[in-house]
Amino acid sequence: QWAQWPRPTPQIPP
């Protein structure tokens, strides 16, 4: 798979 979920997502500011 291309994306492995769940995975730790970085906190990106809006």
From Swiss-Prot:
GO terms for cellular component: extracellular region. The keyword Protein biosynthesis does not apply. The modification Pyrrolidone carboxylic acid is found at Q1, Q4. GO terms for molecular function: peptidase inhibitor activity; toxin activity. It is found in: Secreted. Keywords: Hypotensive agent, Metalloenzyme inhibitor, Metalloprotease inhibitor, Protease inhibitor, Pyrrolidone carboxylic acid, Secreted, Toxin. Its main location: secreted. Expressed by the venom gland. Disulfide bonds: none annotated. GO terms for biological process: regulation of blood pressure. Belongs to the bradykinin-potentiating peptide family. Bradykinin-potentiating peptide 11a-F is present only in female snakes. This peptide both inhibits the activity of the angiotensin-converting enzyme (ACE) and enhances the action of bradykinin by inhibiting the peptidases that inactivate it. It acts as an indirect hypotensive agent. Bradykinin-potentiating peptide 11a-F has much lower activity than BPP-11a. This is Bradykinin-potentiating peptide 14a. It comes from Bothrops jararaca (Jararaca).
